[in-house]
A protein has these predicted regions:
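Glycine-biased low-complexity/repetitive sequence motifs
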Residues: 1-225
Length: 225
């Protein structure tokens, strides 16, 4: 979709396509554009039979650049890689959503890459199934949470994988030792978000990491949570 805000034109892609620049400006700084690239998140792991749930998938990678001539409030993760466009078509890749674990003891899939202008955001790491055996979360833009159970002491997937600066995401949460107190023996962890790590395994629901907000679409929206 294409919308306008003041003198700015905002192109939003929710699927693959082509960003077409028909004509550039005679003023060079106006050809440096703002962009936001967000990948798809990882799926959540399959749950158990009432004794334990799967861990959360990590958020897709988040990468943003704000042109000096674009008047909006950027996220805390705004980067420093400018793109100067010319009159041509730029392929857009939007990562398809991941699959969650469909049943107990079934893992999810990782998220998928989104890209434009050679700027790529990594898909989120998958969550793992519970409760039959603990596993480490998968790495990705943000990492998937670790799952609980025996033998325990599992690690959330690493975020910002592959590494970029500023970071595109954070780690998934970890799980504790086995056996744990009965109420938390199978607790799994939350996936990471662009704005913070996933919550470690504990009794009760585990939260995923928070996203980050940007006004690149002319109003504040939180992404990659």
């Amino acid at each position: 979709t294409v919308t306008e805000s003041g003198n700015c034109r905002i192109h939003t892609f929710t699927g693959p396509g082509t960003f077409t620049v028909a004509q550039t400006s005679a003023t060079a700084p106006e050809n440096v554009i703002s962009y936001l690239v967000v990948a798809s998140g990882g799926g959540g792991g399959g749950g158990g039979d009432g004794s334990g749930g799967g861990s959360g998938g990590g958020a897709g990678g988040f990468r943003e650049f704000k042109s000096p001539v674009t008047p909006y409030t950027a996220s805390p993760l705004v980067g420093s890689t400018p793109i100067t466009v010319t009159a041509q078509g730029y392929p857009v890749v939007v990562g398809a959503g991941a699959s969650g674990g469909p049943a107990a003891s079934v893992n999810a899939t990782n998220g998928n890459v989104s890209s434009i202008f050679g700027i790529s955001s990594a898909g989120g790491g998958a969550g793992k199934h519970g409760p039959c055996g603990s596993q480490n979360g998968e790495p990705g833009g943000s990492g998937g949470g670790a799952s609980g159970g025996n033998p325990g002491c599992r690690t959330g997937g690493s975020g910002n994988t592959p590494p970029v600066s500023p970071v595109q995401g954070t780690n998934g949460g970890n799980t504790g030792s086995f056996p744990q107190p009965p109420a938390s023996v199978y607790d799994s962890a939350g996936g990471g978000g662009a704005g913070g790590v996933g919550q470690n395994g504990q009794p009760g629901p585990r939260a995923g990491g928070p996203g980050v907000a940007t006004e690149i679409t002319a109003s504040p929206v939180t992404y990659a949570a």
